[in-house]
């Protein structure tokens, strides 16, 4: 594990991991980092009630800087979340109510907290909310003190909004157009409040970050820096962090630890070593050694298991990881005796297909309702051919009717057809 990375070459180490997309004045920043600890920030807008995988790389980057002795500021956008960032978005965002945004702010702040250390002396993390400075600011102050420093000519040339300005069907509202000023002022404000000298963010944030750098120079005559992390792509060109069911969330109530773990297990060989560099704190030498070992082992690579274990532990803790592994193991070997009621709740949430049934239903009905079989006739043949298990036990009687002993924790019955097709019956 890398502990305190030497600060002066921290940028180099991030580059070796493929974690730097763009950086302003790299030499001056490296020099500034070599002089001693700095404060840096990353902003998270509450656009939903949870962060998702796309937020993980910048969040872990804050952690990497903190491990190297720097002071991270996690900014939750209580104000910017009310406006909506138009950067590279094809259409105007729906405005959310103040109550909703406030609720999301609280959830996201709680989600960010475990990744950073808020009690470690000089470089303890700080949680900030931009509603604190924008909430009471009036429009004249905004236009005179902030707006005066922004050139519309430059703003309309920013890549992030260009596509919206050039389309007749999807223009951009004044609300979203002014987002750039808000994020710019955040940087200037945090520079004044906490001496923040660096902003990090996803590569789509470059335009907002450079605006903040200019504004900080104009308002406070301070030189500050920006660094963006790349947008994560997969080798096959498909979007990272999405499954058939949508985004992969960090909130266990939205994506269960089991589903989260499985997401990483299913990483392609072409991506897995790169992802170990992005999403874990393993030493690069260790990752390269693992790649070498996988290449020469003649067996299935071990890297996916290492990745799944590391990231699940980071996000869901030891307990979440243990549950995910326990469920994975039980489904693989068909022995459900180790599963807890909470494990079944994870499976019902998003782990395997799930149906609800009234008590008194028979096995054939369950196979048809669960779409494990197209018809009762086909189900009858499948059961008779010994291809169906109930809670891991073979059941070859086509006339079988479920009994209370089949209902684990009084509620759950796991059906399997063949090797891999599962359905969880939840009894009403």
From Swiss-Prot:
Any one biological process term the GO annotation gives: tyrosyl-tRNA aminoacylation
Gene Ontology molecular function: ATP binding; RNA binding; tyrosine-tRNA ligase activity
InterPro entries per record: aa-tRNA-synth_I_CS (IPR001412), aa-tRNA-synth_Ic (IPR002305), Rossmann-like_a/b/a_fold (IPR014729), S4_RNA-bd (IPR002942), S4_RNA-bd_sf (IPR036986), SYY-like_C (IPR054608), Tyr-tRNA-ligase (IPR002307), Tyr-tRNA-ligase_bac-type (IPR024088)
Residue ranges of the motif 'HIGH' region: 46-55
Protein location: Cytoplasm
Binding site for ATP: 242
Tagged with keyword Cell wall biogenesis/degradation: no
A GO CC term attached to the entry: cytosol
Membership in a protein family: Belongs to the class-I aminoacyl-tRNA synthetase family. TyrS type 1 subfamily.
Role description: Catalyzes the attachment of tyrosine to tRNA(Tyr) in a two-step reaction: tyrosine is first activated by ATP to form Tyr-AMP and then transferred to the acceptor end of tRNA(Tyr).
Protein name from the UniProt record: Tyrosine--tRNA ligase
Organism taxonomic ancestry: Bacteria, Pseudomonadati, Pseudomonadota, Gammaproteobacteria, Enterobacterales
């Amino acid at each position: 594990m890398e502990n305190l990375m030497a600060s002066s070459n921290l940028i180099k180490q991030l580059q070796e991991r493929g974690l730097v997309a763009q950086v302003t004045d790299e030499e001056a920043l490296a020099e500034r980092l070599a002089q001693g600890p700095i404060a840096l920030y990353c902003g998270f807008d509450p656009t939903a009630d949870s962060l998702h995988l796309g937020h993980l790389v910048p969040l872990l980057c804050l952690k990497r800087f903190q491990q190297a002795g720097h002071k991270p500021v996690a900014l939750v956008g209580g104000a910017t979340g009310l406006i909506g960032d138009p950067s590279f978005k094809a259409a105007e965002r729906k405005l959310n109510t103040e109550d909703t945004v406030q609720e999301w702010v609280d959830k996201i702040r709680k989600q960010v907290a475990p990744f950073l250390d808020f009690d470690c002396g000089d470089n303890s993390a700080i949680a900030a909310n931009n509603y604190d400075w924008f909430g009471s600011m009036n429009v004249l102050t905004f236009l005179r003190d902030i707006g005066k420093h922004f050139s519309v000519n430059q703003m309309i040339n920013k890549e992030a909004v260009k596509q919206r300005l050039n389309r007749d069907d999807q223009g951009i509202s004044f609300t979203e157009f002014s987002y750039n000023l808000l994020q710019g002022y955040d940087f200037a404000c945090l520079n004044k409040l906490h001496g923040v000298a660096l902003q990090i963010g996803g590569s789509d944030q470059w335009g907002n970050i450079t605006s903040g750098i200019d504004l900080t120079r104009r308002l406070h005559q301070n030189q500050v820096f920006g660094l963006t992390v790349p947008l994560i792509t997969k080798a096959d060109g498909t979007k990272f962090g999405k499954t058939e069911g949508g985004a992969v969330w960090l909130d266990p109530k939205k994506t269960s630890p089991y589903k989260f773990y499985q997401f990483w297990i299913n990483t392609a060989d072409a991506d897995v070593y790169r992802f170990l560099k992005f999403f874990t704190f393993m030493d690069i030498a260790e990752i390269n050694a693992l790649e070498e070992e996988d290449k020469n082992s003649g067996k299935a690579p071990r890297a996916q298991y290492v990745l799944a274990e590391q990231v699940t532990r980071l996000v869901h803790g030891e307990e979440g990881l243990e549950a995910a592994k326990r469920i994975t193991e039980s489904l693989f070997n068909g022995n459900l005796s180790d599963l807890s009621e909470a494990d079944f709740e994870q499976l019902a949430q998003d782990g395997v297909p799930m149906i609800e049934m009234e008590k008194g239903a028979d096995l054939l009905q369950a196979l048809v309702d669960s779409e494990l079989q197209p018809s009762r006739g086909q189900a009858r043949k499948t059961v008779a051919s010994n291809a169906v298990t109930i809670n891991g036990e073979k059941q070859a009687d086509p006339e079988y009717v479920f009994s209370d002993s089949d209902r684990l924790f009084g509620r759950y019955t796991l059906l399997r057809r063949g090797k891999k097709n599962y359905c969880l019956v939840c009894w009403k």
